[in-house]
Amino acid sequence: MKFDAGSFRDPSGRVLRYENRILRAVFEAGVPQFGAVKDSGVLNEMIGDGWLMPAETPADDGLDALAPGAIHWLEHPVLDFVSYPYEWCFSALKAAALHHLDFHVALLGRGFTLSDATAYNIQFRGTKPVFIDHLSIIPYEE
């Protein structure tokens, strides 16, 4: 088991690699927002529309020992290649930025927003950008 090095800032959850799996632990701090987003159906809608990285609820097979205090678990597909914004060419930066903005607008239209706007929340599946941080999606409040 190895926590992803880039997954340490958000008290709502962490991403870890375990037995060739990508898992996201949701901790108590993230339960209210995650529950609201999940119960609204917006996660499945955004996944279905290709905006958001797919996620499944994994079978409970002893995962709690990997991240004590985790309340919920998500499992994501393993990406063939992980890249970072400082490695991207201009066209990839542009595609990622436009995806991020369009995704945020789509969320706002459904009563949700993003808690942060970091380029590190975008990865590429082939040449297509996809948002990867499910716990950054929160209910919009005036």
Regions found by a protein language model. Name each.
Residues 11-12, 118:
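Residue-level marker for the onset of beta-strands and adjacent loop->beta junctions
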Residues 37-51, 89-115:
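Conserved kinase catalytic-core helix
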Residues 113-142:
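Catalytic activation segment of kinase domains across protein kinase-like and atypical kinase folds
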Residues 19, 24-27, 36-39, 62-75:
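N-terminal structural segment of carbohydrate-active enzymes
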Residues 12-37, 86, 90:
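ATP-binding glycine-rich loop module of kinase domains
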Residues 1-5:
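Short, Gly/Pro- and small/polar-rich lid/capping loops
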